[in-house]
A protein has these predicted regions:
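Long, low-complexity, intrinsically disordered polar/charged segments
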Residues: 1-7, 37, 130-142, 229-232, ...
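Short, glycine-/small- and polar/acidic-enriched structural segments
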Residues: 1-117, 123-126, 142-148, 159-166, ...
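Solvent-exposed, polar/charged alpha-helical surfaces in well-ordered, non-transmembrane soluble domains
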Residues: 6, 14-15, 34, 38, ...
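Residues that scaffold the ATP/ADP-binding catalytic core of kinase and kinase-like folds
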Residues: 20, 54, 154, 188-189, ...
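Ligand-binding clefts/hinges and TM-proximal coupling segments of bilobed small-molecule sensing domains
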Residues: 22, 99-117, 121, 195-229, ...
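Pocket-lining segment of extracytoplasmic ligand-binding domains
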Residues: 49, 125, 130-220
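Secondary-structure end/capping motifs
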Residues: 187-265
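Conserved C-terminal helix/tail region of periplasmic/extracytoplasmic solute-binding proteins
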Residues: 255-282
C-alpha cells in the first residue's frame, strides 16, 4: 500500500507490528480485492467504493476500521462553462477505472446527492486518467472523476477546476478508504486481527497528528509521489484515523444508497450487507 492507503506499511515502518509481537510482510500487487478475497494478504487499506459490491457478490472481505475521507473529486476544464454538476446533464463523464468500479460508484453518489441520475441524466464512460484532459479539450468528455493528487498540479496551473468533491460538506463526514481484512482470517484469528487493526490505526493517528513528519517519511520511502507542498496539503485534508462510529455510520448510509441506486444488485437487505461488510475489531 502507498499514498493515502499507506497505513499498513507505515505501521510496519514505525515498528507498531513488532510492538504487538507480530511480524509483517508487505506484498505489492495490482488488486487488493483479489488478494484479500483469496487470503493472499490479511490486511489492506483501500476504497470502500471498490470493495463493497464484491463483498455482496461473495468475495471474502470485511471492513475492520476506517482510514480517511476525501481522495477523489469531479474535475472539468478551468475555462469550461461547467460550474456545477447540474451543468453536466446530457454530458459524458469519465470514470477512469471503469464501469461498475470505484470511480463509477463514487461518481454515482456525488451526482445523486445533487439530484442527478447517473444512468439517465449523464453518460458515464471510461477514459484513462492520463487521457482525460485531452479528451476534455477534444470535447469527448465534459468531466472526469480524478484523484486529488493527480489533479493537484493541473488545478494549480489553471488547467482544471473542481466542481464536486468528497471533501465537500455533505461527504466530508463520510469514509472514503477503509481498513479491510480477509473475512475468514478475522473469524479464525480475532486476537491477531485486533492487534493488526490497533497497529494500523496507531499509524493513522501518527499520520494525522504529525502531518509534516509523516509526509516526509512517506516521500522518503517512495509511498508519496510529487512535491512536499502538495502532499502535506492533501495528507492534512484526509483526516487519517476515523472512529468506528464514523465508519459504521458511513457504511449504513452508503449501503442504503448503493441498493437504491442499483449499484448493489445481488442483495437487497441493508442489515445483512452490513453484517457481511462491517466487523469492527477494536
Amino acid at each position: 500500500s502507498d499514498g493515502c492507503t499507506s497505513g499498513p506499511t507505515m505501521a510496519d515502518h514505525l515498528g507498531y507490528y513488532a510492538e504487538a509481537g507480530l511480524t509483517a510482510e508487505g506484498v505489492k500487487g495490482s488488486s487488493d480485492v483479489e488478494a484479500l478475497g483469496t487470503n493472499q494478504v490479511d490486511v489492506a487499506t483501500g476504497m470502500m467504493a471498490k470493495m463493497l459490491v464484491p463483498i455482496t457478490n461473495g468475495v471474502d472481505i470485511t471492513f475492520t476500521g476506517g482510514a480517511h475521507i476525501g481522495c477523489k473529486s469531479l474535475y472539468v476544464l478551468a475555462d469550461s462553462e461547467y460550474a456545477t454538476t447540474a451543468d453536466l446533464k446530457g454530458q459524458k463523464i469519465s470514470v477512469p477505472n471503469g464501469i461498475g468500479k470505484s470511480d463509477y460508484n463514487i461518481t454515482a453518489l456525488l451526482l445523486d446527492a445533487d439530484g442527478i441520475n447517473y444512468s439517465t441524466d449523464v453518460e458515464l464512460v471510461q477514459v484513462s486518467a492520463d487521457a482525460c484532459v485531452t479528451a476534455m479539450e477534444n470535447g469527448e468528455i465534459a468531466a472526469a472523476l480524478l484523484s486529488d493528487t493527480f489533479a493537484y498540479a493541473m488545478v494549480k496551473d489553471g488547467k482544471l477546476k473542481c466542481i464536486r468533491s468528497q471533501l465537500d460538506t455533505d461527504f466530508a463526514d463520510r469514509v472514503c478508504c477503509v481498513m479491510a481484512m480477509n473475512g475468514t482470517f478475522v473469524k479464525e484469528n480475532p486476537t491477531i486481527a485486533k492487534k493488526v487493526a490497533q497497529a494500523v490505526q496507531k499509524a493513522h493517528s501518527y499520520m494525522r497528528d504529525n502531518p509534516e513528519e509523516a509526509t516526509k517519511v512517506l516521500m522518503d520511502m517512495g509511498w508519496n509521489g510529487g512535491n512536499y507542498e502538495m502532499n502535506i496539503m492533501i495528507n492534512n485534508s484526509l483526516q487519517f484515523g476515523l472512529s468506528d462510529e464514523f465508519t459504521g455510520d458511513t457504511l449504513k448510509d452508503f449501503i442504503e444508497r448503493y441498493i437504491r441506486l442499483g449499484l448493489i444488485t445481488s442483495m437487497d437487505n441493508a442489515d445483512e450487507i452490513l453484517d457481511l461488510a462491517w466487523t469492527p475489531v477494536l
